[in-house]
Amino acid sequence: MKLDVIKLDGEAAGSVELDEALFGLEPRADILHRVVRWQRNKAQAGTHKVKTRSEVSYSTKKIYRQKGTGGARHGARSAPIFRKGGIYKGPTPRSHAHDLPKKFRKLGLKHALSAKAKAGELVVIDMATSEGKTATLAKQIKNLGWKRALVIDGAQVDAGFAKAAANIDTLDVLPSMGANVYDILKRDTLVLTKAGVEALEARLK
């Protein structure tokens, strides 16, 4: 698969040959769904917690005697049956992460790249460099028509470009090792540098 390469100012900069094994697959929603679910579950904090009857701030004294009152049998006010009592079998802190094989995660990334290529939402630029000025980069992005974009560079992201992009909320920047299915699908446009293409092909071959 051949794709035109452009510069940040919109000028042509030749073309690049993309590996069909990475960018030419028929995207499968089930694979993408499983990988995104794995990512989001792993990222979930899992700090949810409610108080049980032994943790609520109440006396543990029996509220009245067992027999002879005509009322139902009760123990302490902290019982779940009472208002402001403890919660029975409520959520406790835990990890929501689950396993997903490495081969499947790698396959998911290939399908995410292929999905962007098939939808016409893949752009290749020669390099992502900047003098560190947000206004300049924002103007270039506007002229290129990128509404919500993810830029994936090579092993290292240019410091000036990262600084300029930091204040643009519609632009994310990642090194090649940070490329993941969720971030690729979240943004409308996937922008790869030539170094990023080479690094991804080396990582996923």
Curated annotation (Swiss-Prot):
Belongs to the universal ribosomal protein uL4 family. One of the primary rRNA binding proteins, this protein initially binds near the 5'-end of the 23S rRNA. It is important during the early stages of 50S assembly. It makes multiple contacts with different domains of the 23S rRNA in the assembled 50S subunit and ribosome. This is Large ribosomal subunit protein uL4. GO terms for molecular function: rRNA binding; structural constituent of ribosome. GO terms for biological process: translation. One of its GO terms (cellular component) is ribosome. The keyword Membrane does not apply. InterPro entries: Ribosomal_uL4, Ribosomal_uL4-like, Ribosomal_uL4_dom_sf. Keywords: Ribonucleoprotein, Ribosomal protein, RNA-binding, rRNA-binding. Part of the 50S ribosomal subunit. It comes from Dinoroseobacter shibae (strain DSM 16493 / NCIMB 14021 / DFL 12).
